[in-house]
Amino acid sequence: MAKTEQRFDYVKIGLASPERIIEWGQRTLPNGQVVGEVTKPETINYRTLKPEMDGLFCERIFGPVKDWECHCGKYKRVRHRGIVCERCGVEVTESRVRRHRMGYIKLAAPVTHVWYLKGIPSHIATLLDMPLRDVEQVVYFNAYVVVDPGNAPNLSYKQLLTEDQYLEIEDQMYEEGSELQLPENWAMIGAEAIERLLKDIDLEKEAEQLREEIASARGQKRARLIKRLRVIDNFIATGARPEWMVLRVLPVIPPDLRPMVQLDGGRFATSDLNDLYRRVINRNNRLARLQEIMAPEIIVRNEKRMLQEAVDALIDNGRRGRMVVGANNRPLKSLSDIIEGKQGRFRQNLLGKRVDYSGRSVIVVGPNLRMHQCGLPKEMAIELFQPFVIHKLIKRGIVNNIKAAKKLIQSNDPQVWDVLEDVIDGHPVLLNRAPTLHRLGIQAFEPILVEGRAIQLHPLVCPAFNADFDGDQMAVHVPLSLEAQAEARLLMLATNNILSPATGAPIITPSQDMVLGCYYLTADNPHAPDLGDRYFASLEDALIAYDRGVIGLHSKIWVRYSGPMELGKEEKESEPQIIEEPGGTRLKITNYRRIREDRDGNVISQYIRTTAGRIIFNKTVQDILSA
């Protein structure tokens, strides 16, 4: 298979001309035979289990089923590469060409593309400036549309006519002495009529006329004109023609993308697309045969409508009319179903691919972590960082080759954990929690090896991830290159993302357990024992007493303290009780402070009334501020 070396920036989905669709699937064999058109609804021969020629799995059109082997078996082996078998016409090549070689079906009558007819808004209806209901009446053979009114006074361009009205005007035209002159196809029905109307549109002229009308239009009419002009401008910009929204050639996707596989019991499982394509081919062939034998118009018209419905079901089953169902009344999966939605080709396979060097696990709280750290399970870390560990093991001379290194890792050798510690030191990892609704949904952390199988997350970063610990899962990704690691450290580290990019307000705010913990530490418990006679020489002494169980967390105690403190409203407003002591000193007593001063008013000592919990809280804050 030829690989393209051409780089591209994006994939654009647009309208394809009938010539382009034929070009996708048509090939000329060395003997001059042109292949590519699928004409038979058969898939495989149930006796030989080989694809039928010119069918939906034809080897001549799509390539051989087996590598380097033609259909009839005349040529086998790679040495016949590129030869086209003169007996069966199959090119001897790799079977994987069946993943990209396309075919096509030439339709016996044009059909509208259901996306452009029934999409919201309907581009065909917008472009023709007709109500969608009227366009549908024409497409599904319920009404005629006037495409050339001739000299008829009571007819106008794009006017809809019922069957009876159409026949009445036809009779008038052929009456003796009638002055009514109408061209042969003055009124048409079905997708042919829509194709004719679309062909008649001069895009440049129409765009110019619309711009003039928009200048003077107001309100609803102006909005409608702008919508129509936008569609026309897009057609002009892309170089597409409006009539391409009506299909004359239908592409057939490669057979390996709609496979047919044999099950154990000899039965076959097949993709729904094959059933939908088979319906189209059967109806198309029947229509071609009816046209050949000059069948009555009513029968031909009914077959054309059925062909239109079959193509609609193939492109987007259920978009219009009843859904086509298969066995067990299950709706068949159309081309649109394959590419749209969460399980579709784009979101599932192209945008959301699974990546190497990644893992996921349940998150649990890690209150002992620093904010820029996360707890990474050893089992996960050894798997994610395995190439780095192997490199380090060889570099240190612990092992000589990769195989020996892998064996050492599998045996859980203590040396491996030492090397792993060394490897992850300073190597950030990315944590992501789905859905990633803003950029803080993925942040970088320094990993700390932990036991168990859960990822430990600092509680402060939970609001950014919108995470909680009721079973949430998070994904881990390892940035490999030095550039990626530097970028993760400088831009994505949790400590660099304290403010919300949306509002500028802090997103790292204490909540839940942290607020409750701070409240519990500093709460004034009226039921706690009042140890008013307990005095401590320093904060450290009080903490030692708490650690030894001498005092409780909320026990009221007096502690000698000379540092800065903020007075509460009650303390500021209360008058101190002053006790004069022998030797000239005096004692000022309030509810929360006891201050001893010398005769000049200098503070000799100060005791404050507090609890062990408040001392712990204050010490923690002071330690962080002075760090």
Curated annotation (Swiss-Prot):
Residues noted as binding Zn(2+) in the record, renumbered to the chain: 70, 72, 85, 88
EC primary class: transferase
Keyword presence, Glycosyltransferase: no
Cofactor note: Binds 1 Mg(2+) ion per subunit. Binds 1 Zn(2+) ion per subunit.
Annotated positions binding Mg(2+): 468, 470, 472
Summary of subunit composition and partner proteins: In cyanobacteria the RNAP catalytic core is composed of 2 alpha, 1 beta, 1 beta', 1 gamma and 1 omega subunit. When a sigma factor is associated with the core the holoenzyme is formed, which can initiate transcription.
Protein name stated in the entry: DNA-directed RNA polymerase subunit gamma
Organism: Synechococcus sp. (strain JA-3-3Ab) (Cyanobacteria bacterium Yellowstone A-Prime)
Taxonomic lineage: Bacteria, Bacillati, Cyanobacteriota, Cyanophyceae, Synechococcales
